[in-house]
Regions:
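Hydrophobic alpha-helical transmembrane segments of membrane proteins
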Residues: 1-70, 84-190
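Short helix-to-coil transition segments within interhelical loops
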Residues: 74-80
Length: 190
């Protein structure tokens, strides 16, 4: 059977290595469409775009709450630092591209361009925080509700500009904690 679902069209540009995105798009396709329409509503009112932006950021972060099996992690045959660097660069790049329609609203509401760019970089910072939290507390085949609460709380705090710096500093510490934790799963590839 070669039945094609509607979301399959959206999955074609997403590489197989970004399985979190593929799974998340499949599970949240209606919510993603809602975010898209709300962002388009931001053309008329900037506050609607901000609400859609926050909702979209938290929705994409939910893609990273479930940990992959250990064999998927080991199939990459990379060192922990190379694995984590590739994951951060690729996935943050895709997230940055997904947020570009929101940044286009800054051209329409040009008086809010500083807030728009600040929110954009705060979201990227929070996204890196979410990925690093996943691998800092990685256990194969688990789902973390505690991690989702922490990410949501930090996400709301990082919207306030002074707290974005704290999240950035926390990312530095989480990076080394994630490397240390992943080292137990990649011991054969060092």
């Amino acid at each position: 059977s070669t039945a094609v679902c509607t979301y399959t069209v959206f999955l074609r540009p997403v590489p197989v290595t970004c399985f979190e995105w593929r799974c998340g798009i499949r599970q949240n396709v209606l919510s993603l469409w809602l975010c898209l329409f709300l962002m388009m509503g931001g053309i008329f009112f900037w506050g609607i775009a901000i609400a859609a932006f926050v909702f979209f950021t938290l929705l994409v972060l939910s893609f990273y709450l479930e940990n992959e099996p250990r064999n998927v992690l080991e199939a990459t045959a990379l060192t922990p630092s190379l694995f984590l660097n590739r994951k951060l660069i690729r996935h943050t790049g895709y997230f940055a591209l997904a947020l570009l329609p929101f940044c286009c609203i800054a051209f329409i509401h040009y008086s809010y361009w500083v807030y728009t760019l600040s929110a954009y970089f705060a979201a990227l910072n929070l996204f890196v925080f979410g990925i690093l939290m996943k691998y800092t507390y990685y256990r194969p085949n688990t789902y973390s509700t505690v991690r989702s609460l922490i990410i949501s709380a930090v996400g709301l705090l990082s919207l306030l500009l002074p707290f974005a710096g704290i999240v950035f500093v926390a990312n530095l510490f989480l990076y080394y904690s994630a490397l240390k934790n992943l080292d137990t799963y990649f011991y054969a590839f060092d």
